[in-house]
């Protein structure tokens, strides 16, 4: 059970009527059965079945924007799957059925997974799975972005259909010991096709002059790429984990993202970089001392930057803004973090740990944030905080 009672303010130009209140209650109940059988068809197997019921009641009020939205979502679902265990193969097949009160027909979602493991140090996997996203209001739809001193509201289109996904992936996983070092390498390729993908399109203004965007079904999208993960460890002394992904996220046809007819549509899915990766290095060279260094690389991406309505901006305003909507190709970022820990043993039962470090050491942060009361508050990308120093104390028993 989860309950949210949130007071909010989504206003611009110190709008006194932009306060709101959201109440959201979600509860889930379900059960599962697992049975092991000596033989099902051709090999020993594990059978799993389960049922689940979800209920979500949402009431969002923002009187200043004339919004009073009530949404009740009820989902009844069930799944069955069987896992066959053979000498070198493990085959898993199953499906899930969901009945959603906002969708006319039940959603059938099958999946298949085949694992090949000839030795303890090597395995290969093939997976096919399906899924959906229901045509309902999500948490991001409740937030009101401010552009040009006015609010931007999101509404659902009439007849909005569910978004469906069809995913394929294949991977190989290799593990080896080289002297006193333990190594692991994972190479994965993936492809996901999205049909009736959700897109946002600007449709005009409401009676209060706020911009209204409508969540509609687009033509479709494709997300595909390769991922490489590696691990290297030498006991407690040092451990390194790295990963890098090359990905393409594209709409199947050009989609409009701005109502300005002079702005070109795009096939790029917004805020999805083509390259991203990470690394984590931990070391404990001494008995009471350990450290960690980690980094996240975020490649360039396309982010919409919306221009304000200049007819409402006073002359000689202290901030300047772009003249028309732009699809910005952002720079890439490398966010490096460092943390040091030292533990003092006070007695047999109590330990005192002092820690300190820095987050975003290189201060990789967006340089072109809009400013002032007419800014595009949704124009934000990259690391969420600039260079930050921290210290901490932890007592354990």
Each model region followed by its residue ranges:
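Gram-negative outer-membrane beta-barrel transporters
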Residues: 85, 90, 184-185, 189-193, ...
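Membrane-embedded beta-barrel scaffold of Gram-negative outer-membrane proteins
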Residues: 1-10, 117, 125, 159-216, ...
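Residues that define the transmembrane beta-barrel architecture of outer-membrane proteins
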Residues: 23-27, 70-76, 106-108, 164-168, ...
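Face-selective signature of the C-terminal outer-membrane beta-barrel domain
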Residues: 1-104, 182-191, 225-227, 239-245
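C-terminal beta-signal and adjacent terminal beta-strands/loops
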Residues: 195, 297-315, 342-397
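Structural signature of Gram-negative outer-membrane beta-barrels, strongest in the C-terminal barrel
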Residues: 44-46, 67-193, 245, 282
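Repeated loop/turn-to-beta-strand initiation elements of outer-membrane beta-barrel proteins
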Residues: 39-47, 88-91, 121-124, 178-183, ...
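Transmembrane beta-strands of outer-membrane beta-barrel pores
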Residues: 1-5, 53-59, 86-88, 95-101, ...
């Amino acid at each position: 059970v989860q309950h949210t009672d949130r007071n909010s303010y989504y206003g611009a130009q110190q709008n006194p009527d932009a306060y709101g209140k959201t109440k959201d209650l979600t509860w889930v109940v379900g059960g599962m059965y697992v049975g092991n059988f000596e033989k099902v068809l051709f090999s020993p197997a594990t059978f799993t079945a389960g049922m689940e019921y979800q209920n979500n009641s949402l009431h969002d009020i923002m009187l200043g924007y004339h919004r009073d939205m009530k949404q009740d979502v009820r989902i009844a679902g069930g799944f069955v799957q069987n896992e066959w265990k053979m000498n070198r193969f493990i085959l898993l097949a199953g499906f899930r059925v969901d009945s959603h009160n906002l969708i006319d027909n039940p959603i059938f979602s099958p999946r298949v997974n085949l694992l090949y493991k000839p030795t303890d140090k090597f395995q290969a996997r093939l997976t096919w799975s399906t899924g959906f996203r229901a045509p309902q209001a999500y948490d991001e739809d409740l937030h009101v972005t401010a552009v040009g001193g006015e609010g931007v509201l999101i509404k659902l289109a009439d007849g909005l259909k569910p978004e469906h996904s069809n995913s394929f992936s294949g991977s190989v996983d290799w593990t080896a010991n080289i002297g006193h070092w333990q190594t692991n390498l994972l190479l994965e390729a993936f492809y996901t096709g999205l049909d009736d993908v959700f897109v946002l399109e600007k449709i005009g203004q409401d009676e209060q002059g706020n911009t209204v965007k409508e969540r509609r079904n687009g033509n479709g999208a494709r997300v595909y790429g390769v991922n490489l993960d590696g691990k290297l460890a030498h006991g407690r002394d040092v451990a390194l984990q790295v990963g890098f992904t090359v990905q393409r996220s594209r709409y199947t046809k050009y989609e409009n993202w701005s109502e300005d007819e002079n702005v070109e549509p795009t096939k790029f899915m917004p805020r999805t970089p083509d390259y991203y990766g990470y690394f984590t290095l931990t070391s404990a060279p001494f008995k009471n001392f350990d450290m960690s260094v980690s980094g996240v690389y975020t490649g360039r991406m396309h982010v919409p930057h919306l221009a304000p309505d200049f007819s409402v901006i006073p002359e000689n305003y202290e901030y300047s803004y772009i003249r028309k909507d732009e699809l910005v190709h952002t720079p890439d970022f490398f966010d490096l973090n460092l943390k040091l820990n030292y533990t003092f043993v006070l007695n047999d039962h109590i330990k005192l740990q002092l820690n300190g470090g820095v987050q975003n050491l290189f201060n990789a942060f967006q340089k072109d944030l809009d400013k002032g009361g007419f800014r595009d508050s949704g124009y934000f990308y990259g690391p969420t905080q600039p260079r930050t120093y921290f210290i901490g104390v932890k007592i354990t028993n």
